[in-house]
């Protein structure tokens, strides 16, 4: 972190001290720049191209040095479109990595990868900036306390509980509800959370970024009257951005979160949607940088790039960063190198299933594929652990019996298996829940269910006390009392029809 004496931003202060080079080659978002002998910039230094294009429009493109090629040339990746750049244009070496504004000045604002505000609310205070590249905290600084982070979402709190100060991944293919789930977590956690939140939109839809901003203004998380009282900073590098911006926007968001953790000593929530796009952007520029592709066409540096980002997302003795990351799973294949590399860094994985989404069960969280390091009796307690294990056993047995049911029918099962299937179907439906952020689509009000209520509900289903209720009574309700009330309503309706 550095304190800038003026508010001129993290750009160039005195050009006389800077190296000047010239563009030698442009291939899409990648530039080769020639510098005078002995004046080569360092890796990760920010370069600025200033000039005028062929129609006399002002150009101001920031690039980041990725490779030193020899013969006094460097290869850099542009953070914005390279349209209008020509060979021979002057390039300024800033002598430092990209730096972005940090601290209270970022709250309530939307920034791009360079730390420039993009919300039309005027310039941001850039007296305090921090470079986006830094090393992860040392082992001695890390905090190892274990505590549960309640989300109010039944399936998550029961089967794959989140760790306070941990890393959580939401895995799913296209259209199974990752973004809706991350929005619900922002709604349930960020609103009740005393600290600050940072949201990094990495290569996702611009419309969703806009919706989130409007929602946060409505809910008061962003305070329009007094912007400094806001609780969230937003950093966007969406689908329309070049790969350089998408590759670095996650680091910009993380740098802002680290300042709140290390300097302000706060507990921070970091939401990233979508971490796969960070890998994808790295893959797009990797071939242009002349690297040989690795498995499935990904960059050979995949693990290193992922590690350099993920290792910085951690909790120290000063404060914590609880990170919730959406992870797109290409073609629903969890063994794809991108999601597989991400798995290794997480404390809890919430896997979304297309099969459950097709049945209309939302959130479509797979109770058997989702895991958490927190689901241990010494952390969550015996009662929670036993209930979760019995729910998983019942769901697993139902899964095993599905082939038999499909071929021979339900009547061919033993009495015990039929009871297991009936309870498993109730559990499957009770794991669904109406969301606050989906109220506008579904028309049913959202529900927040406390952990104690969740455990009580599943214990009642497993004990057989609710065997007499129809399974549709458990679909899209909050706690178990709502399910019994819904069953009574269904009973009254069926009698009226007769």
Swiss-Prot record:
Domain of life: Eukaryota
GO (cellular component) term, any one: mitochondrion
InterPro entries with a match to the protein in the record: AAA+_ATPase, ATP-synt_VA_C, ATP_synth_F1_bsu, ATPase_a/bsu_AS, ATPase_alpha/beta_chains, ATPase_F1/V1/A1_a/bsu_N, ATPase_F1/V1/A1_a/bsu_N_sf, ATPase_F1/V1/A1_a/bsu_nucl-bd
Gene Ontology molecular function: any one: ATP hydrolysis activity
Gene Ontology biological-process annotations: proton motive force-driven mitochondrial ATP synthesis
Residues making up the signal peptide according to the UniProt record: none
Enzyme Commission (EC) number: 7.1.2.2
Membrane topology: Peripheral membrane protein
Top-level EC class as recorded in UniProt: translocase
Subcellular location as annotated: Plastid, Chloroplast thylakoid membrane
Presence of keyword Thylakoid: yes
Transmembrane segments: none
Binding site for ATP: 172-179
NCBIfam families linked to this entry: atpD
Similarity section: Belongs to the ATPase alpha/beta chains family.
Chain's role: Produces ATP from ADP in the presence of a proton gradient across the membrane. The catalytic sites are hosted primarily by the beta subunits.
HAMAP family membership: ATP_synth_beta_bact (MF_01347)
Protein name: ATP synthase subunit beta, chloroplastic
Native source organism of the sequence: Canella winterana
Lineage: Eukaryota, Viridiplantae, Streptophyta, Embryophyta, Tracheophyta
Gene this protein is translated from: atpB
């Amino acid at each position: 972190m550095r304190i800038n004496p003026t508010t001129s931003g993290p750009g160039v202060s005195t050009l006389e001290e800077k190296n000047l080079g010239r563009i030698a080659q442009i291939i899409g978002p990648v530039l080769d720049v020639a510098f005078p002998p002995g004046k080569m910039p360092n890796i990760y230094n920010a370069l600025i191209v200033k000039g005028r294009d062929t129609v006399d429009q002002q150009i101001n493109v920031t690039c980041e040095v990725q490779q030193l090629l020899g013969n006094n040339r460097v290869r850099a990746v542009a953070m914005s479109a390279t349209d209008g750049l020509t060979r021979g244009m002057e390039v300024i070496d800033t002598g430092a990595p990209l730096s972005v504004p940090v601290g209270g000045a970022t709250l309530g604002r939307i920034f791009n990868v360079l730390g420039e505000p993009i919300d039309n609310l005027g310039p941001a205070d850039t007296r305090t900036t921090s470079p986006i590249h830094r090393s992860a905290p040392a082992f001695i600084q890390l905090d190892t306390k274990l505590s549960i982070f309640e989300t109010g979402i039944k399936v998550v709190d029961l089967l794959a509980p989140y760790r306070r100060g941990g890393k959580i991944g939401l895995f799913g293919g296209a259209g199974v509800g990752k973004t809706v789930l991350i929005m619900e977590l922002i709604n349930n956690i960020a609103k009740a959370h005393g600290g600050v939140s940072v949201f990094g939109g990495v290569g996702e839809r611009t419309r969703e970024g806009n919706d989130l901003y409007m929602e946060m203004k409505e809910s008061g998380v962003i305070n329009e009257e007094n912007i400094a009282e806001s609780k969230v900073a937003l950093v966007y590098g969406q689908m329309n951005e070049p790969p350089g911006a998408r590759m670095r926007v996650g680091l910009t968001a993380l740098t802002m979160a680290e300042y709140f953790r290390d300097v302000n000593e706060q507990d921070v929530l970091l939401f990233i949607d979508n971490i796969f796009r960070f890998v994808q952007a790295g893959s797009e520029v990797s071939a242009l940088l002349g690297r040989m592709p690795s498995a499935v066409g990904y960059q050979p540096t995949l693990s290193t790039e992922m590690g350099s980002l993920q290792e910085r997302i951690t909790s120290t003795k000063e404060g914590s960063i609880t990170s919730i990351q959406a992870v797109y799973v290409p073609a629903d294949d969890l063994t794809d190198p991108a999601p597989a590399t991400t798995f290794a860094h997480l404390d809890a994985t919430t896997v979304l299933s297309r099969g459950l989404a097709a049945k209309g069960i939302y959130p479509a969280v797979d109770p058997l594929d989702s895991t958490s390091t927190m689901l241990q009796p010494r952390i969550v307690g015996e009662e929670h652990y036993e209930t979760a294990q019995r729910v998983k056993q019942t769901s697993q047995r139902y899964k095993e019996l599905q082939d038999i049911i499909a071929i021979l029918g339900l009547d061919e099962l033993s009495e015990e298996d039929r009871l297991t299937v009936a309870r498993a179907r109730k559990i499957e439906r009770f794991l669904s829940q109406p969301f606050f952020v989906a109220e506008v689509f579904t028309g049913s009000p959202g529900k927040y269910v406390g952990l104690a209520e969740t455990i009580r509900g599943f214990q009642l289903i497993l004990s057989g006390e609710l065997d007499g209720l129809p399974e549709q009574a458990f679909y899209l309700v909050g706690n178990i009392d709502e399910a019994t009330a819904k069953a009574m309503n269904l009973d009254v309706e069926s009698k009226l029809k007769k």
